């Protein structure tokens, strides 16, 4: 339950952009009310994130909110960043974009290079540590900021830059387009981007009775209610939006004294037990439960190596009720029982992790309480090791 579910000690993905890519609604329902947007973000974000992951969503909510009352992307960016603690790495990363934009106002690629060089190493997400993949909120928000600043209000140019920056390059340009859509209004969006939506405007999304038209109306009504709730006025012809000073959010910084030092590519299978030793103060196993019905172990192994992981198989079983129970013993003591559902919508892609152990040598043993090796195996893709002492120039081991 939140906020524990979003805490980095319980969630290796705490700094990821999960909330950031869902936070559009936060600013849309608080038009021009950046402080209220931040308060909503604080309530919702800790379901799945904390620290920089929380700030990523708060930042996006602030962008949308500010875009209702400002028409300068640089000013919108400044307003969205006001509530983020300056001591946080998230703030520092986005602030670097602002500084680099002033230094290289016509060269977004140089800005991109400098940001990647300084902020492009993931710490928590097992899919990205010591790899090129990076779902960390701050660098993806930095690419949003780059699109807004270097795009100079041009809808297509802004989204193109955000896309070409890479990483989560569907969500980042979508955020940029959404913020500019608010700033420009529907009539200000170029026909090239606007007209295709007309064809699907009234079509319900699959599995729902909600269309773009209905969703827009829901959002509009939410915004009016929140405006009135905060002392604003709504009439048939006019809306008066109340504003309030922005308060800086509490400081949250994940993975303190926890630096990735080694990635050990295992490509191994656990049928009943699995053991390993390491030196440091933490570990995170990237892997998942795999159902062998309809596929062979060899096929699963080949696909896992090709895709740098077996995540594809964790998404495959939508109705399987099996739940694996894995005991995790650290230094001879039972630390946790990891619950791994086979059902795709309840999947868990890290069988076990532990941070902030005493620095030193540790042993880990996993024991499967309810194994069924004829139907289920646990894939161990890789293990990331952590230390309280950062190291340089160590990237990957296979």
Predicted feature descriptions by range:
Residues 236-280, 286-323, 389-398:
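Glycan-recognition and processing domains
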Residues 4-14, 23-33, 42-47, 62-166:
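Accessory "access/gating" subregions that flank catalytic or transport cores
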Residues 20, 37, 56, 73-76, ...:
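Stable alpha-helical elements in mature extracytoplasmic
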Residues 1-10, 14-19, 257, 393:
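Accessory carbohydrate-recognition regions in carbohydrate-active enzymes
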Residues 91-130, 183-271:
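Acidic, carboxylate-rich catalytic segments that either coordinate divalent cations
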């Amino acid at each position: 339950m939140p906020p524990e579910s979003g805490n980095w000690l319980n969630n290796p993905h705490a700094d990821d952009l999960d909330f950031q890519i869902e936070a559009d609604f936060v600013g849309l329902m608080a038009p021009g009310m950046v402080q209220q947007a931040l308060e909503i973000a604080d309530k919702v974000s800790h379901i799945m994130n904390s620290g920089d992951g929380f700030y990523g969503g708060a930042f996006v909510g602030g962008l949308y909110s500010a875009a209702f009352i400002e028409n300068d992307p640089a000013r919108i960016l400044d307003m969205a960043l006001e509530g983020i603690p300056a001591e946080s790495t998230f703030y520092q990363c986005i602030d670097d974009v602002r500084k680099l934009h002033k230094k290289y106002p016509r060269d977004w690629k140089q800005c991109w290079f400098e940001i990647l060089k300084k902020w492009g190493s993931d710490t928590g997400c097992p899919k990205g540590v010591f790899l090129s993949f990076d779902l960390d909120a701050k660098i993806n928000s930095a690419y949003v900021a780059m699109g807004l600043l270097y795009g100079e209000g041009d809808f297509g140019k802004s989204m193109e830059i955000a896309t070409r920056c890479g990483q989560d390059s569907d969500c980042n340009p979508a955020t940029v387009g959404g913020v500019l859509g608010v700033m420009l209004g529907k009539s200000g969006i170029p026909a090239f981007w606007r007209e295709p939506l007309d064809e699907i405007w009234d079509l319900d999304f699959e599995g729902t009775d909600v269309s773009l038209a209905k969703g827009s109306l829901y959002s509009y009504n939410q915004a009016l209610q929140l405006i009135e709730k905060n002392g604003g006025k709504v009439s048939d012809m006019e809306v008066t939006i109340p504003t309030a000073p922005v308060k800086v959010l509490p400081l949250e910084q994940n993975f303190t004294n926890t630096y990735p030092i080694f990635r050990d590519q295992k490509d191994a299978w656990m049928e009943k037990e699995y053991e390993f030793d390491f030196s440091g103060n933490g570990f995170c196993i990237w892997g998942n439960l795999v159902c062998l019905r309809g596929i062979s172990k060899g096929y699963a192994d080949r696909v896992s190596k090709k895709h740098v992981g077996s995540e594809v198989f964790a998404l495959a079983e939508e109705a399987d009720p099996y739940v694996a129970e894995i005991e995790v013993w650290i230094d001879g003591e039972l630390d946790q029982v990891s619950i791994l559902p086979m059902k795709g919508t309840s999947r868990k892609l890290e069988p076990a992790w532990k941070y902030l152990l005493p620095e030193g040598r540790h042993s880990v043993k996993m024991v499967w309480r309810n194994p069924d090796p004829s139907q289920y195996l646990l894939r161990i893709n890789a293990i990331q090791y952590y230390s309280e002492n950062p190291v340089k120039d160590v990237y990957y081991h296979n």
